[in-house]
């Protein structure tokens, strides 16, 4: 199969999330875990981006002037707050329903986001490039992880960053992120995640480094039931985030 014929889209996953599109912005709905997860991932993105680009994370618009791609943006839970930080944000999702919800909410909120119903490969083929590519809670829902990561890496500008957040493929993750979260705690609808589609860190790092990027940070993320908050952790057995950077010099 030629690379041009490959696709990152798992239509079953697109259909699953399209069916829940109306609930994206409900903090008590089916996407409640993402609402809870947003503060820790936004802080991580802001701080690491500011460190890389020499910005003040405490300023009102620390990402001013940076072009950001939120791939698999869903209803825009991440795109909107990143845009509020001053970034010029493109939110991409293959689901027309998700993009419709995201666009309507952004307009009502007075936030400017360029939402597009497109795939990662369509953006890459069009020659789009970004200072930051956000790949958050997406890779476990795509059809071809290696091709997806390679495609996303192509869009990272020299000196730019790619953030990835997902769930590790471990028995601990199967017990906590799937069985407990979907069947006991009912945080997520059953079937949201499938064990065989979870992704180990090295399966992300390999295509990123092969694409000329350097892995600069790895962190686990865990939920503290006492504080009802997500926090960074050294434990990457369940939820984790990776950060990679392309050299400021053109290397290919």
From Swiss-Prot:
The keyword Transferase applies. GO terms for biological process: methylation. Its EC number is 2.1.1.222, 2.1.1.64. InterPro entries: SAM-dependent_MTases_sf (IPR029063), UbiG_MeTrfase (IPR010233). It holds the Pfam family Methyltransf_23. SUPFAM superfamilies: S-adenosyl-L-methionine-dependent methyltransferases (SSF53335). It catalyses: a 3-demethylubiquinol + S-adenosyl-L-methionine = a ubiquinol + S-adenosyl-L-homocysteine + H(+); a 3-(all-trans-polyprenyl)benzene-1,2-diol + S-adenosyl-L-methionine = a 2-methoxy-6-(all-trans-polyprenyl)phenol + S-adenosyl-L-homocysteine + H(+). It is an enzyme of class 2 (transferase). S-adenosyl-L-methionine binds at residues 41, 72, 93, 136. Pathway: Cofactor biosynthesis; ubiquinone biosynthesis. Keywords: Methyltransferase, S-adenosyl-L-methionine, Transferase, Ubiquinone biosynthesis. Gene3D superfamilies: Vaccinia Virus protein VP39. GO terms for molecular function: 2-polyprenyl-6-hydroxyphenol methylase activity; 3-demethylubiquinol 3-O-methyltransferase activity; polyprenyldihydroxybenzoate methyltransferase activity. HAMAP family: UbiG (MF_00472). PANTHER family: METHYLTRANSFERASE, UBIQUINONE BIOSYNTHESIS O-METHYLTRANSFERASE, MITOCHONDRIAL. O-methyltransferase that catalyzes the 2 O-methylation steps in the ubiquinone biosynthetic pathway. NCBIfam families: UbiG (TIGR01983). Belongs to the methyltransferase superfamily. UbiG/COQ3 family. This is Ubiquinone biosynthesis O-methyltransferase. It comes from Rhizobium leguminosarum bv. trifolii (strain WSM2304). The gene is ubiG.
